[in-house]
Amino acid sequence: IRCFITPDITSKDCPNGHVCYTKTWCDGFCSRRGERVDLGCAATCPTVKTGVDIQCCSTDDCDPFPTRKRP
């Protein structure tokens, strides 16, 4: 599977059986810069924590950089 990976936002091969993920959350600059974004691949979908949104998928390049809402 190929997933987009931050910080370069380039598509890279991930090991067999892995999933792609998009993780977004707010930090102290969220009101000015928008949500923080982490793209990558993992053996399993990361555990969701309070204040963090995680989307997982299992097809090539299914985790593009999300469109940001203007603050």
UniProtKB/Swiss-Prot annotation:
CDD domains assigned to the protein according to its UniProt record, in alphabetical order: TFP_snake_toxin (cd00206)
Keyword Cell inner membrane attributed: no
Signal peptide: none
Highest taxon above the source species: Eukaryota
Gene3D superfamilies hit by this protein: CD59
Record has Methyltransferase as a keyword: no
Transmembrane segments: none
GO terms, molecular function: acetylcholine receptor inhibitor activity; ion channel regulator activity; toxin activity
Keywords, in A-Z order: Acetylcholine receptor inhibiting toxin, Disulfide bond, Ion channel impairing toxin, Neurotoxin, Postsynaptic neurotoxin, Secreted, Toxin
Covalent S-S links between cysteines: C3-C20, C14-C41, C26-C30, C45-C56, C57-C62
Record's subcellular location: Secreted
UniProt tissue specificity: Expressed by the venom gland.
Annotated Gene Ontology cellular component terms: extracellular region
Function: Binds with high affinity to muscular (alpha-1/CHRNA1) and neuronal (alpha-7/CHRNA7) nicotinic acetylcholine receptor (nAChR) and inhibits acetylcholine from binding to the receptor, thereby impairing neuromuscular and neuronal transmission.
UniProt similarity note: Belongs to the three-finger toxin family. Long-chain subfamily. Type II alpha-neurotoxin sub-subfamily.
Name of the protein this chain belongs to: Long neurotoxin 5
Species of origin: Naja naja (Indian cobra)
